[in-house]
């Protein structure tokens, strides 16, 4: 039997913290939802600005569906609202602006799971609130939806507030770099240029798909004719989500590639008088290259 409503929100928070203590699963939901709506593999898109109004509006449904699917262990379908969590009806609302949630009148008296994510800053927020007139603005829009009032915002209990999610590397690149990468005619050339340009940055698979615009796009990275082979003579290695690659990234104090992510870096042999982070591959000590270092063919990196 449901407890007192004030306890409901602490139950929701506990439920999520018990299955996703660091928020990594929620973070992945937002990355996947953006990638899904961009559909970069088929469209080459990588930004909310490139979507039509209808597509933008659809992002909320995609987020809701993906949260429901990812958290099947704690969320059921609601009878009147989107979700049922701990025997309570919960409406899931996404807004691309920080406090823009549109609350339908039928949600009054129920709880809300309020979501916001910004792909430009790679930060997301998820919080819970009980919807009643005291937290909503008076008067709604044409279809009777209301927004959370400025005074009502303090009643949101945040599960995550401006937590990072896997970055959209492409949005973080210089516009000239973006244009140069996308102007190349073949998927292979675009991928090679991406890894040349966006070094030491985690590159999610969605960006690889967007740039390659080909089926089995992850295969385009590998040795045997992929980007790893193409960039080896330039001294650049591409690390993936293999443990051996994560260890290399860690040893060189680089960002660690997450699931499905890649990261490129140019290497140079450690000189006898140098004292800096290095990694040993096939008996040679390698460090991150500096701009002033000449190009030396990169080692072939192990996968185990």
What are these regions (language model features)?
Residues 83-84, 88-93:
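Extended, Lys/Arg-enriched charged tracts that mediate electrostatic binding to polyanionic substrates
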């Amino acid at each position: 039997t449901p407890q007192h409503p004030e306890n409901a929100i602490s139950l929701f928070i506990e439920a999520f913290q018990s299955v996703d203590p660091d928020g990594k699963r929620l973070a992945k939901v937002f990355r996947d939802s953006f990638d899904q709506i961009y559909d970069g593999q088929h469209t080459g898109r990588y930004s909310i600005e490139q979507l039509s109004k209808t597509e933008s509006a659809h992002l909320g449904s995609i987020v809701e569906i993906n949260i429901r699917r990812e958290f099947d262990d704690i969320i059921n379908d609601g009878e009147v609202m989107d979700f049922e969590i701990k025997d309570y009806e919960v409406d899931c609302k996404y807004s691309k602006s920080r406090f823009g949630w549109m609350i339908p009148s039928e949600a009054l008296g129920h709880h809300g799971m309020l979501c916001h994510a910004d792909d430009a800053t790679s930060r997301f927020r998820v919080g819970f609130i009980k919807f009643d007139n005291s937290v909503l603005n008076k008067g709604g829009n044409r279809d009777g939806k209301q927004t959370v009032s400025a005074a009502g915002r303090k009643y949101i209990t945040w599960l995550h507030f401006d937590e990072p999610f896997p970055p959209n590397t492409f949005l973080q690149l210089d516009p000239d770099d973006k244009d140069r990468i996308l102007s190349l005619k073949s998927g292979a050339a675009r991928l090679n240029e991406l890894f040349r340009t966006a070094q030491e940055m985690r590159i999610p698979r969605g960006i690889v798909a967007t740039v390659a615009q080909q089926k089995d796009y992850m295969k385009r990275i590998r040795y045997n004719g992929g980007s790893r082979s193409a960039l080896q003579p330039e001294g650049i290695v591409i690390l993936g989500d293999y443990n051996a690659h994560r260890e290399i990234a860690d040893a060189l104090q680089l960002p660690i590639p997450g699931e499905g992510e890649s990261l490129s870096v140019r290497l140079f042999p450690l000189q006898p008088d140098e004292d800096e982070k290095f990694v040993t591959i096939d008996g040679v000590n390698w460090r991150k290259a500096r701009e002033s270092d000449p190009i030396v063919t990169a080692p072939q990196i192990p996968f185990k």
